Amino acid sequence: MGLFKKSSPFKNSAAVLADNGFTDAYIEALKKDIEPLKKPKDIAKGQSYLINALIIAGRLEEACSLYEKHSAENLFVKLDKMLYPNLLHNVIFAYFIRNKYKNAETIYKEKNDIVLRDTSDTMKRSLALHECMNGRYENAVTVLAKLLDSDCRFVDLCIVKTVLKLDMFSRANELSANFGEYKGRNELEAEAQKLKKKIFDGLSPKEKVRAVKKGK
């Protein structure tokens, strides 16, 4: 991958990523790598990496603002056929979590040929979110359920948020088992906590007792 080539303008931040993962330290290192860039293609690539990193870190509002700024400048048309769809999938997810459905749907519809360009799991996640945002919750759950054992990020948040639209509190409780992984991840942690509260409020008295005993 270009991110890890020795000649890559992102080699310094790539080293931080390899050592620390998608942390604030990586985000700051990436910002420093982007600053001196002159070529639009390199800037587009760097900003796409940055937006994705911000989303993974749960800094969703910041990521969306950055996307909106550079999208208005048509910067991302410089991205290659793999990076551009992945960026759009992640931004759609960020808007979905922030309940900015109109923004997510605008990307899905206006850039539909790019969003649906591949058959990746992230594309399937975007398709499911589109179904959910249009009230077709059963369709969304069907698609997301098939992604639960995949490497696609954030599927548990997406499916729990969707299952709760169907008032399936017990199922949502089961699907939220790994929400602890979002601890320290800003807006993602806040969303996980909000969903857990909604789940608990909807459980039967017996299920609530069971959940408390399990420390959920």
Report the location of each language-model feature.
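Eukaryotic alpha-helical solenoid repeat scaffolds
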Residues: 21, 153-216
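Alpha-helical segment of the N-proximal tetratricopeptide repeat
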Residues: 8-32, 36, 49-56
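Flexible helix-coil transition and linker loops at the boundaries of alpha-helical arrays
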Residues: 33-43, 72-82, 112-120
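Alpha-helical repeat scaffolds
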Residues: 26-33, 60-73, 101-113, 137-148, ...
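"A position-specific structural signal for the A-helix of alpha-solenoid helical repeats
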Residues: 12, 49, 90, 126, ...
